[in-house]
Every structure is written in structure tokens, then in C-alpha cells.
């Protein structure tokens, strides 16, 4: 037992229950058939792994029923050695089981580490695919800014036309008297569109030829199938008329404006607060209002800005004097600044040059429904949502806050509209005022031009007045002759009696007299009234001539 204890101390602690079981078995063998009483104890103490050595020991007992003391010790040592081996085997069995588990864990860890990497790569690829930014047509960029933007934003390559359009283009280019041959068409497409790879993919040309033949766009002059010569069919007149009718019917209603073109102007008008620096205001005013001559006389602009700040129409956020940043003040929706041309120029400059231009979706919805209602408001809102998504994909807009069709958006490129685009009503009103001023000026000029002609008419009328006076005097002279009272008829009668016989000869002599001819020369002798007056004058002048002749004779 001492040897057993000494050996037990050196044995692994897992082997202790096995040793205790072996000792109990040895005690049972020495007793007289005590197996019935000890069996439940053995079963309770021994584990399932100890069952195989029990069977071996039972066989050994049958072979050697009467062992000696030395043999007992040897048996105990052998049993101990045999019992020592199973835990080693069990530990060895446990190790290989644990190894694959650890390997599986490492593989799982590696897989889990690889999965996020793949997800990140997929996300980056998706972003690269989505973000194909282009520069919009409404962006106002200088040459240097445009070059910089083209470097930063990978421009999407212009897509080539479809195969059907390429085929018709090739047939027209290679057309001859007998049409365009398939060989010439193939060479043309390979030379002009190498990206198609028609050398390897000849079926593309065959399919396109078949499609166009079925549609009636082209006609086969020679050959059959995908060989021979082809000609583009000219469009007949009836379909053109139908197209024109369709176009006319389409033009009857007002053409709808695309919301893509409306958005930048909407952002410019709805962005609040509106502010701009002095340099940007000066640049805008000098560009769109050259009459003010701000480049030559910058003091006018500075004085106008300072005056607007003093009146409370503008608020100076940064800087002092005429330098810094200025912000528009409003009463409700109308700005306080306005009136003179300089103030209107400053107002339009601050509204246009305000950066960055941001706007909320609620304000956008209200603006679109008021200015571009369309046939159906719900459909218009759907279009607005789609346009916002499209502009965001193209890189024209950025969503600052919110998700989807809510939040705030911002223009990615600068947009500086002209005053006519920004305030069309005011511009038209200003142009009307200018037209009125021009009309007034023209009318005043015309009146000034018309003033001298009245003077000329007066100058021309003066002789007419003199003629009228002479005529009236003559008429007065003639009238009393006609209306002479009966008492004076006896005195006046002898003069006309003597005058007619003597007036014939002096009348002939008096006609060539220059005094008589020169006087009527200034007046208009064409009028019959003047001729009648001259006839009335002649007898009176004849009398005076007769008197002079009588005096000379005497």
C-alpha cells in the first residue's frame, strides 16, 4: 500500500479515481465473494472510461484464480500502469479534437474579417459607379474654374450612338450608284467605331441589317441576307405631314419647362439670408450695369452701400465702411432696398452672388406649385422628387440634412443669373419706363423739330395776311362803290363815264408798268381769287394813270 501511495503521488491527478477503484477490486479478490456488496460501490466510483480494463481483469481472474502476494503486487502495478495509459490516451484524444475546433475558429475569424473588407469594396465600387459627376449647363464658371472642375470631377464619356444609327450613317457615307456594299459598311464602322469590336462580333452588323430591313429604313438592292448592297429609304411625304400635324398639335399647348432648368433659379430666389461681399457686388454691377461706370467711379457704389446701411436697408455683417459683407433686409417678402438704378443694381447683385445657395424641400414644393403647377399637382411633386434624385446622382446638388424627399439641398456649382432672369417683371417694368422716357424724349425732340416749321408757315402766311388786308381794303373800296348812296351817284358817275373810253389806251400802257406787275409777283397768282382781285385793281390804277397823263398834257 505504501508503494501504491508513493506511486499515487507521482501519478497525474486525473488518474487518482482509477487507482482507488483498482485497490477496491484487489480487496474484493482477497475476501470471500464480496462482489455482490461492492459492485454498486464500484459502479458509483468508476467512470465510463474504466469499463474496458474491468473486462480484462475479469479474464485474468479466470485464468489465474489463486495468485500469490508477489503476484498481487505485480498485478496491482500492472493495473496501475494500465490505468495510467487511458488518461494519456484520453488527453491525446482531447487534443486532436480541440485542434480542429481552434482551426475552425481561426477560419471563421478570417472569414468574418474578410467579409467587411468585401462589403467595403462593394460599397466603394457602388459609389464609384453612382458618382459620375458632370458639369451642368447652368453653371457659371470661368475658364480656370471650368478646367479645375473638369480635373476634379471625372466627366462621363459621351455615349456612342446605337448600332442602328451607326448602320444608317455608314450606308450614307459609303453610298455609290449601286448602293453601299456590306464590305464597305463593315470597314467604315471598324475604322470609326473601334470600341464596338466588329472584327470579333460580326453578328452585330447582321442583326442591325435584319432589323432595319424589317422596319423599312433600308432597302437591299443586290444580294441576299447579310451580303450585297443596301440603300437608305427616303422618307415619303405623307408621314412628314402626319409628323407636322403631330408637332402642330403638340405645339398648341404651352411647352412645359423642365424642372432641372428651374431648380437653380428657385434656389437663388428662395435662399435666405442673402449676402455678398463688396468685391462680388462690384463685379456684378460692372458686368450687367455698364452705364453706372463702377470701374471708373467706385466711390458711387461705396457711397450707395453706406447710405443703404444707414437707412437700414442693408446690414453690414463684416468689415467697416464700404468693405466687408452686406446682407439684405426684408419687410415680409419684399426687400427694403430699391428705388434708384444704383440701389436696384445692388439688390440684384446681392441676390445673384449669394453663396452657397441652399433651400428646403418645403419651400421648393411651394415654389413649384405656384410658378409651375402643371396639370396634376401630385404628378408634379413626383417629378420634383425624381429630378432632385437625378441631380444628386449627377453631382449637381448635395443633400445637407434629412433623407429622401425631405431636408435641405445645396447647389454644388456656382450660379449667377442676370438681372433679366432673376427679376423679369422688374426688368420689363424698367424697360417700359425707359421706353416711356425715350418716347417722351422723342416727342420733345419732335416738338422741338416741329417748332421751326410753324415759324416758316408764319413767314409764308405774312404775305397772305398782307394780301388779305389789301384784298379786304380793295373789297371795302369796291363795296362802297357798289353801295354808293343815291345822293353821291351823280358825283361818281361822271368819272366812270370818262374813264371807259380813255381807260382803254392807258390800260394797255399801264399793264407793262413794273410797279403794277411787281406787286402781285410776291403773292400767289395761281389762285382765282387773287386774279379776280387784280382785275378789280386795274380800273382804279387806270384812273390814276389817266389823271397823271392829263396833268402832263396840260
UniProtKB/Swiss-Prot annotation:
Gene Ontology molecular functions: DNA binding; nucleosome binding; structural constituent of chromatin
Cross-link (Glycyl lysine isopeptide (Lys-Gly) (interchain with G-Cter in SUMO2)): 64, 97, 258
InterPro entries reported in the protein's UniProt record: H1/H5, Histone_H1/H5_H15, WH-like_DNA-bd_sf, WH_DNA-bd_sf
Keywords: Acetylation, Chromosome, DNA-binding, Isopeptide bond, Nucleus, Phosphoprotein, Repeat, Ubl conjugation
Modified residues (Phosphothreonine): 51, 85
GO BP: cellular response to hypoxia; heterochromatin organization; nucleosome assembly; regulation of cell population proliferation; regulation of DNA-templated transcription; regulation of nucleus size
Residues bearing the modification Phosphoserine: 6, 144, 157-158, 249, 443-444, 447
Compartments it resides in: Nucleus; Chromosome
Biased amino acid composition, Basic and acidic residues: 94-129
Annotated GO CC locations: chromosome; nucleosome; nucleus
Cross-referenced Pfam families: Linker_histone
PTM-bearing positions, type N-acetylalanine: 2
Signal sequence region: none
Compositionally biased residues, Acidic residues: 60-71, 430-451
Domain H15, first and last residues per copy: 159-234, 255-330, 337-413
Modified residue annotations for N6-acetyllysine: 192
Chain's role: Component of heterochromatin that maintains heterochromatin integrity during G1/S progression and regulates the duration of G1 phase to critically influence cell proliferative capacity. May play a role in hypoxia-induced oncogenesis.
Recorded domain comment: A central region that included the first H15 (linker histone H1/H5 globular) domain binds at the entry/exit site of the nucleosomal DNA.
Name of protein: Heterochromatin protein 1-binding protein 3
Organism of derivation: Mus musculus (Mouse)
Organism placement in taxonomy: Eukaryota, Metazoa, Chordata, Craniata, Vertebrata
Name of the gene this protein is made from: Hp1bp3
Amino acid at each position: 500500500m505504501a508503494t501504491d501511495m508513493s506511486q499515487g503521488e507521482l501519478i497525474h491527478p486525473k488518474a487518482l479515481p482509477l487507482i482507488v477503484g483498482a485497490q477496491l477490486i484487489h480487496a474484493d479478490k482477497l475476501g470471500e465473494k464480496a462482489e455482490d456488496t461492492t459492485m454498486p460501490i464500484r459502479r458509483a466510483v468508476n467512470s465510463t472510461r474504466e469499463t474496458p480494463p474491468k473486462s480484462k481483469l475479469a479474464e485474468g481472474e479466470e485464468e489465474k484464480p489463486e495468485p500469490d502476494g508477489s503476484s498481487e503486487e505485480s498485478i496491482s502495478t500492472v493495473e496501475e500502469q494500465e490505468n495510467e495509459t487511458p488518461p494519456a490516451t484520453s488527453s491525446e484524444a482531447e487534443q486532436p479534437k480541440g485542434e480542429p475546433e481552434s482551426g475552425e475558429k481561426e477560419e471563421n475569424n478570417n472569414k468574418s474579417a474578410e467579409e467587411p473588407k468585401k462589403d467595403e469594396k462593394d460599397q466603394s465600387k457602388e459609389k464609384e459607379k453612382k458618382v459620375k459627376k458632370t458639369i451642368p449647363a447652368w453653371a457659371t464658371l470661368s475658364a480656370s474654374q471650368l478646367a479645375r472642375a473638369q480635373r476634379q470631377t471625372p466627366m462621363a464619356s459621351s455615349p456612342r450612338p446605337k448600332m442602328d444609327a451607326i448602320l444608317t450613317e455608314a450606308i450614307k457615307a459609303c453610298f455609290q450608284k449601286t448602293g453601299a456594299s456590306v464590305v464597305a459598311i463593315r470597314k467604315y464602322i471598324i475604322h470609326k467605331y473601334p470600341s464596338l469590336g466588329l472584327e470579333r462580333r460580326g453578328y452585330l452588323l447582321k442583326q442591325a441589317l435584319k432589323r432595319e430591313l424589317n422596319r423599312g429604313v433600308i432597302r437591299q438592292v443586290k444580294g441576299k441576307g447579310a451580303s450585297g448592297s443596301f440603300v437608305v429609304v427616303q422618307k415619303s411625304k405623307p408621314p412628314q405631314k402626319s409628323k407636322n400635324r403631330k408637332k402642330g398639335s403638340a405645339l398648341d399647348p404651352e411647352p412645359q419647362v423642365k424642372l432641372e432648368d428651374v431648380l437653380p433659379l428657385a434656389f437663388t430666389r428662395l435662399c435666405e439670408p442673402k449676402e455678398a461681399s463688396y468685391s462680388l457686388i462690384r463685379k456684378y454691377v460692372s458686368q450687367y450695369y455698364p452705364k453706372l461706370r463702377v470701374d471708373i467711379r467706385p466711390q458711387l457704389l461705396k457711397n450707395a452701400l453706406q447710405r443703404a446701411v444707414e437707412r437700414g436697408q442693408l446690414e453690414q455683417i463684416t468689415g467697416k465702411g464700404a468693405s466687408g459683407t452686406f446682407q439684405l433686409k426684408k419687410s415680409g417678402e419684399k426687400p427694403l432696398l430699391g428705388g434708384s438704378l444704383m440701389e436696384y443694381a445692388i439688390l440684384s447683385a446681392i441676390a445673384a452672388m449669394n453663396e452657397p445657395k441652399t433651400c428646403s424641400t418645403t419651400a421648393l414644393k411651394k415654389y413649384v406649385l405656384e410658378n409651375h403647377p402643371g396639370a396634376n399637382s401630385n404628378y408634379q411633386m413626383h417629378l420634383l422628387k425624381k429630378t432632385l434624385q437625378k441631380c444628386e446622382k449627377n453631382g449637381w446638388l448635395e443633400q445637407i440634412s434629412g433623407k429622401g424627399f425631405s431636408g435641405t439641398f445645396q447647389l454644388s456649382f456656382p450660379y449667377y443669373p442676370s438681372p433679366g432672369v432673376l427679376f423679369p417683371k422688374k426688368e420689363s417694368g424698367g424697360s417700359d419706363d425707359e421706353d416711356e422716357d425715350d418716347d417722351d424724349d422723342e416727342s420733345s425732340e419732335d416738338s422741338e423739330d416741329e417748332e421751326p416749321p410753324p415759324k416758316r408757315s408764319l413767314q409764308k402766311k405774312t404775305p397772305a395776311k398782307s394780301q388779305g388786308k389789301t384784298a379786304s381794303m380793295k373789297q371795302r373800296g369796291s363795296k362802297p362803290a357798289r353801295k354808293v348812296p343815291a345822293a353821291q351817284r351823280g358825283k361818281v358817275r361822271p368819272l366812270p363815264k370818262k374813264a371807259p373810253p380813255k381807260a382803254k389806251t392807258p390800260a394797255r400802257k399801264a399793264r407793262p408798268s413794273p410797279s403794277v406787275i411787281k406787286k402781285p409777283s410776291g403773292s400767289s397768282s395761281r389762285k382765282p381769287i387773287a386774279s379776280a382781285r387784280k382785275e378789280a385793281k386795274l380800273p382804279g390804277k387806270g384812273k390814276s394813270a389817266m389823271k397823271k397823263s392829263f396833268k402832263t398834257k396840260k
